Design a protein with these regions (language model features):
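A beta-rich soluble binding module of mature secreted/lumenal proteins
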Residues: 2-5, 12, 16, 22-212
Length: 212
């Protein structure tokens, strides 16, 4: 089996995981009522332009491809059609592993204050993505899902204060997550492994010029 998370087989597994969640949600709505957890509350109105750019993944309840991610960075940029280009960059299994990337596309759900997105890894399936927390200074965010299957604590810097981390974990637990499933993502910068470079912002071109 190919162990490179950039391999199409890995990307397909990630897409299928979200597709299975989407199908389960559809089944519960279309058939007999199923016991469901409460919808994740949002962070309120989100300034989408300010939210764009690079986010270091501090901790997560991981999807299958990112279960051993190191130096994980999620980058966002607004497309001309209003959707959100996403670049998830990480190294699988160690700081010296090759860089792997995934490129889902986000769509903001109307009427959610820009706080709920649908992430598409594989057409036509879309996965719920809720901005559940956003610090007033815009430096930390907590992404959750109503199924409580995956979550991401992200920050504008590779490390955050212990108190901020504990507060985020308390919030995640209050939302109904099992903290035993949380994995702290190793972050070490600057990089020294293959393809060592600062993560290019999703809204920058190859020369570093911001795309308009």
């Amino acid at each position: 089996m190919d162990q490179n998370p950039s391999h199409p087989r890995w990307r397909l597994r990630a897409a299928l995981a979200f597709a299975a969640a989407a199908l389960a949600a559809c089944a519960s709505r279309g058939g007999a009522p199923a016991a469901r957890l409460p919808t994740i509350p949002t962070a309120g109105q989100v300034d989408l332009a300010r939210f764009m750019g690079d986010w270091y993944v501090i901790a997560h309840v991981p999807t299958w491809p990112e279960r051993a991610a190191f130096n994980a960075v999620e980058s966002y940029s607004l497309r001309e059609d209003g959707r959100i280009a996403t670049r998830f960059r990480f190294r699988h299994g160690g700081f010296d592993a090759p860089v792997s990337t995934m490129h889902p596309v986000g769509t903001v759900r109307p009427g959610t204050g820009n706080a709920v997105w649908d992430m598409q890894f594989l057409w036509p399936f879309q996965a719920e993505y809720v901005i559940a927390e956003l610090s007033p200074d815009g430096q930390r965010t907590l992404i959750a899902r109503s199924d409580r299957d995956y979550a991401w604590l992200m920050a504008r810097t590779p490390q955050i204060a212990p108190q901020a981390y504990e507060q985020a974990m308390a919030r995640l637990q209050a939302l109904g997550y099992d903290l035993q499933k949380v994995r702290r993502v190793p972050q070490r910068w600057p990089e020294s492994g293959p393809d060592a470079a600062p993560p290019q912002r999703a809204n920058e071109g190859p020369t570093g010029e911001v795309a308009r």
